[in-house]
Amino acid sequence: MRIQGINHLLFSVKCLERSIEFYKKALGAKLLVKGRTTAYFDLQGIWLALNEEPDIPRNEIHQSYTHIAFTVGEEEMEEAYERLAGLGVNILKGRPRDPRDRQSIYFTDPDGHKFEFHCGTLNDRLDYYREAKPHMTFFDD
């Protein structure tokens, strides 16, 4: 078996209507279908699904660094920040960052799922780590 890529992303949400508005306005996702407790979007070719599950505890989600990062052009980072701020999105304080590691904006959806807009690539990150973090071990093919 060979993994061919990510098939879809699904998030459990407390309020489907509130989350639909967030994903449409904050991420520009196109709503494809909405049911009583589920919604499907097209997010720049990514299948994004929401399931309304109002009774699931969500306390621990705020303590985790787990997140999904989307690529945004470096020239669009300020516009992305202003868009999120204008929508009243919860923008998180990012970690201290070396300029070689490029820019990021961290934020949450209404249920606390963390997202990042990042303008760097994996190779940018690896090059930076090779220069700045001698304690790391790299495994090249």
UniProtKB/Swiss-Prot annotation:
Residues 5-120 form the VOC domain. Coiled coil: none annotated. Keywords: Antibiotic resistance, Cytoplasm, Magnesium, Metal-binding, Transferase. This is Metallothiol transferase FosB. Its EC number is 2.5.1.-. It is found in: Cytoplasm. The keyword Cytoplasm applies.
